[in-house]
């Protein structure tokens, strides 16, 4: 799905407007795109197709690439999902493409990180201040990692307390699931460090 946004009110920086067409200074947010959608974006922005396809592999590693006037930044971002009546934590790659005229974000799933910008929760956000926008995205990613790590820590402590009281498979499975989440986060954070 392709959504195009642009800051329109300089007195209210967090207010953005949804557009029908790509304009200079806009933000193109792409979620779980089809090949046709990526081809359309490529034709309208002249961004290399490998930049646009970069986030389509959920195992893609974090990196930075520069080609002509386009900059590709890939970072792993945290997600939560309901799995067997329990909240599980995972990471997926987010591609951020900085072009001469716009910012393009591409992710396999709808992200709370980007939804915060759409819903006006990020103050002093302007779609046309592309470098600043990238820094704000990275800050939001770090904020969500910290939030989820605190949640995982609290759940681990609770599960450990239950485990000390009763040695049941359910608690062991929950603890292993949390441990798996920590491994995902740790690997992604190490990868983002590069």
Identify the function of each model-found stretch.
Residues 1-194:
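Peripheral, non-transmembrane regulatory/ligand-interaction domains of membrane transport proteins
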């Amino acid at each position: 799905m392709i959504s195009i946004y642009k800051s329109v009110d300089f007195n209210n920086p967090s207010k953005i407007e949804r557009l029908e067409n790509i304009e200079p200074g806009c933000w193109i947010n792409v979620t779980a795109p089809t090949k046709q959608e990526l081809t359309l974006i490529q034709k309208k922005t002249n961004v290399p197709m490998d930049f646009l396809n970069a986030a389509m592999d959920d195992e893609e590693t974090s990196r930075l690439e520069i080609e002509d006037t386009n900059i590709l930044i890939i970072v792993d971002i945290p997600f939560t999902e309901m799995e067997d009546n329990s909240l599980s934590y995972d990471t997926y790659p987010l591609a951020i493409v900085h072009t001469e005229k716009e910012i393009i974000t591409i992710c396999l799933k709808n992200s709370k990180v980007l939804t915060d910008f759409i819903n006006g929760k990020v103050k002093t956000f302007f779609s046309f201040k592309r470098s600043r926008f990238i820094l704000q995205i990275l800050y939001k990613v770090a904020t969500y990692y910290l939030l989820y790590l605190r949640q995982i820590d609290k759940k681990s402590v609770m599960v450990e307390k239950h485990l000390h009281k009763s040695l049941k498979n359910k608690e062991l499975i929950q603890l292993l699931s949390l441990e798996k989440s920590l491994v995902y986060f740790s690997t992604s954070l190490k990868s983002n460090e590069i």
